[in-house]
Curated annotation (Swiss-Prot):
<dbReference type="InterPro" id="IPR002616">
    <property type="entry name" value="tRNA_ribo_trans-like"/>
</dbReference>
<comment type="function">
    <text>Catalyzes the base-exchange of a guanine (G) residue with the queuine precursor 7-aminomethyl-7-deazaguanine (PreQ1) at position 34 (anticodon wobble position) in tRNAs with GU(N) anticodons (tRNA-Asp, -Asn, -His and -Tyr). Catalysis occurs through a double-displacement mechanism. The nucleophile active site attacks the C1' of nucleotide 34 to detach the guanine base from the RNA, forming a covalent enzyme-RNA intermediate. The proton acceptor active site deprotonates the incoming PreQ1, allowing a nucleophilic attack on the C1' of the ribose to form the product.</text>
</comment>
<feature type="binding site">
    <location>
        <position position="305"/>
    </location>
    <ligand>
        <name>Zn(2+)</name>
    </ligand>
</feature>
<keyword id="KW-0479">Metal-binding</keyword>
<feature type="binding site">
    <location>
        <position position="144"/>
    </location>
    <ligand>
        <name>substrate</name>
    </ligand>
</feature>
<comment type="subunit">
    <text>Homodimer. Within each dimer, one monomer is responsible for RNA recognition and catalysis, while the other monomer binds to the replacement base PreQ1.</text>
</comment>
<feature type="active site" description="Proton acceptor">
    <location>
        <position position="90"/>
    </location>
</feature>
<protein>
    <recommendedName>
        <fullName>Queuine tRNA-ribosyltransferase</fullName>
        <ecNumber>2.4.2.29</ecNumber>
    </recommendedName>
</protein>
<feature type="binding site">
    <location>
        <position position="308"/>
    </location>
    <ligand>
        <name>Zn(2+)</name>
    </ligand>
</feature>
<dbReference type="InterPro" id="IPR004803">
    <property type="entry name" value="TGT"/>
</dbReference>
<feature type="region of interest" description="RNA binding; important for wobble base 34 recognition">
    <location>
        <begin position="270"/>
        <end position="274"/>
    </location>
</feature>
<dbReference type="Pfam" id="PF01702">
    <property type="entry name" value="TGT"/>
</dbReference>
<keyword id="KW-0328">Glycosyltransferase</keyword>
<feature type="binding site">
    <location>
        <position position="215"/>
    </location>
    <ligand>
        <name>substrate</name>
    </ligand>
</feature>
<keyword id="KW-0862">Zinc</keyword>
<keyword id="KW-0819">tRNA processing</keyword>
<dbReference type="GO" id="GO:0005829">
    <property type="term" value="C:cytosol"/>
</dbReference>
Length: 371
């Protein structure tokens, strides 16, 4: 089930509600990444506390470990991980195509070696849909071929055409499995505007309830990613949710919303947190730096997260330098809370018709830098 209601537009920025089998999501929304069924350094209560509405699970990794036979015993991923809100799963394609020296690609699918035990495995649109059906994610993704940003036009066109054929196979398999959830198509085309449009037009035939923009944030320069968003955002169908995969920094989220994107996921806030890189309203802070050793202030005095309300930069600096697990947890709570606050503020700004003003103030604040 998927029902998307668009409540308000302010320029291309959108404010909507997405109804799924495990609950409603207010958009625009950021989805924390739970690769193996857990958001690193967070438990489900932490996620509820920061007001996470939906999380992402990784089909490839969950297929390899713990395996479908385990998750199936719990009725799907929700029961296995103790999370009662919506879940989105990717198709597994990105991870498989990252194994460039360990895989063989054909029209049927992709053969690769398991990085865990060396077993020979095969992923096809049909198998990806089977895995995601067992996971019972609220939103599943079609299997597509993920092309790097530097792909030639000829390679990009050939790839997107195969992704369109795989989109058709994904949808048929999804329906044959009687999956009650939603399946999104993925717009590909590398860094070529006309190919992106060709991909989008090809997907229209299959009438997916939502569309994702894939193949960005894969090593291309930031201006190139923004150029593609500028080109693709305005032509995405208005009545469907728009998902930008694997992006990104706070600035990327704001640029995406300004160009019509409703949904985001990225490992950046969690990965950076574990490395002592904290996001704040006034720029980024590296908690490992020695200048924080005696600093009694919180990460951000305007932040209401658990870490900022209870602990000093000095303590977080100590935890990070000592390699304490609590340090990673508190840093992650802060970063994900900050991302959720940004999204909530953008939702409110669009509702009030003041998104451009909010955006200008956001950039001014971020450029100021942290004291």
């Amino acid at each position: 089930m998927l029902k998307f209601t668009l409540h308000k537009k302010d320029g291309l920025a959108r404010r909507g509600t997405l109804e799924l089998n495990h609950g409603k999501i207010e958009t625009p929304v950021f989805m924390p990444v739970g690769t193996y069924g857990s958001v690193k350094a967070m438990n489900p209560q932490n996620l509820h506390d920061i007001k996470a509405q939906i999380i992402l699970g990784n089909t490839y990794h969950l297929w390899l470990r713990p395996g479908l036979e385990v998750v199936e015993q719990f009725g799907g991923l929700h029961g296995f991980i103790g999370w009662d809100k919506p879940i989105l799963t990717d198709s597994g394609g990105f991870q498989v195509f990252s194994l460039s020296d360990m895989r063989k690609l054909t029209e049927e699918g992709c053969t690769f070696k398991s990085p865990i035990n060396g077993d020979k495995l095969f992923l096809s649109p049909e198998i990806s849909m089977k895995i995601q059906t067992v996971l019972n994610s609220d939103i599943a993704m079609q299997l597509d071929e993920c092309t790097p940003g530097e792909t030639t036009r000829e390679q990009a066109r050939k790839s997107l055409q195969m992704s369109l054929r795989w989109a058709e196979r994904s949808k048929k398999a999804f329906e044959d499995l009687k999956n009650p959830n939603a399946l999104f198509g993925i717009v590909q085309g590398a860094m070529y505007e006309d190919l992106r449009e060709e991909s989008l037009r090809g997907l229209e035939e299959f009438d997916f309830p939502g569309l994702a923009v894939g193949g960005l944030s894969v090593g291309e320069p930031k201006p190139e990613m923004y150029r593609m968003l500028h080109a693709v955002g305005p032509i995405l169908p208005e009545h469907k949710p728009h998902y930008l995969m694997g992006v990104g920094t706070p600035e990327d989220l704001v640029y995406g919303v300004a160009h019509g994107i409703d949904m985001f996921d990225c490992v950046m806030p969690t990965r950076n947190a574990r490395n002592g890189w904290l996001f704040t309203r006034f720029g980024d802070l590296k908690i490992k730096n020695a200048k924080h050793k005696l600093d009694k202030r919180p990460i951000d005095e305007s932040c209401t997260c658990y870490a900022c309300q209870n602990f000093s930069r000095a303590y977080l600096h100590h935890l990070h330098r000592a390699g304490e697990i609590l340090g990673a947890q508190l840093n992650t709570i802060h970063n994900l809370h900050f991302y959720q606050v940004i999204m909530a503020e953008m939702r409110e700004a669009v509702e009030q018709g003041k998104f451009a003003d909010w955006q200008a103030q956001f950039h001014e604040n971020r450029a100021r830098g942290v004291d």
